[in-house]
Amino acid sequence: MVHFSGVQLLLMFALFALAVLLPVWAIRRIARAVPPACRAPGVAGGVGGLLLFTIVLLIIEAVNALYHFGRAAGEAARVISMSTDYLWPVVQTMIPDFAASFFLLIAIGALVFGRSPAALGAAVVCAWLGGPLVAILRTIYLGLPIELAGEPTGLLFLTVVVTLYLLFANRPALTYGTASGRRLAASRGGSADGARA
């Protein structure tokens, strides 16, 4: 059994926090350079608040998937170096985490750089593909049982909450210029082209 000292645990926590906070800071700076698709006086728009928190949740999920993918790739290299007979079974174990990383990074990119309803739709679809669907793939490929308090259920709940927020809240509607965001901007005397109202 592996035992970690307090300093090692603190270092791992600091590295994980840095791996999350540094991209969040960079994403906030980059995302604020791209104006929201619509503006309405008195209503927050652009990447910030709960929308930034939603992106942070997706970043945490993506960092976790990338970590598991990297760990599985290291184990795969070790097993393949011993015998190439196990190439496909070993590669199979990496497919879910690779898919999760891929789709979650697309969702994050769409939310940060996109300012259209299509970008919002792509982010929602990729969040579903990178979250619960990949967790179900993991149970299929790795033969893990589906438990009520397990990963697929938790990711399903998180993805439902994220989807409801992205589709029905005012900030994402204004940021990505959905029909409800354009109506809100028009009703408040704002603009629908990203210019300051």
Name the predicted role of every residue range.
Residues 66-81, 134-146:
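Juxtamembrane "helix-exit" motif on the non-cytosolic side of transmembrane helices
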Residues 3, 17-67:
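Cytosolic juxtamembrane helix and N-cap/initiation of the first transmembrane helix
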Residues 84-101:
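A loop-to-helix transmembrane entry motif
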Residues 24-45, 108-123, 162-190:
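Cytosolic juxtamembrane helix at the C-terminal end of the final transmembrane segment
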Residues 13-26, 101, 105-108, 132-136, ...:
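Hydrophobic core of alpha-helical transmembrane segments in multi-pass integral membrane proteins
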Residues 144-154:
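Non-cytosolic membrane-interface motifs at loop->transmembrane helix junctions
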Residues 100-103, 119-142:
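Hydrophobic alpha-helical membrane segments
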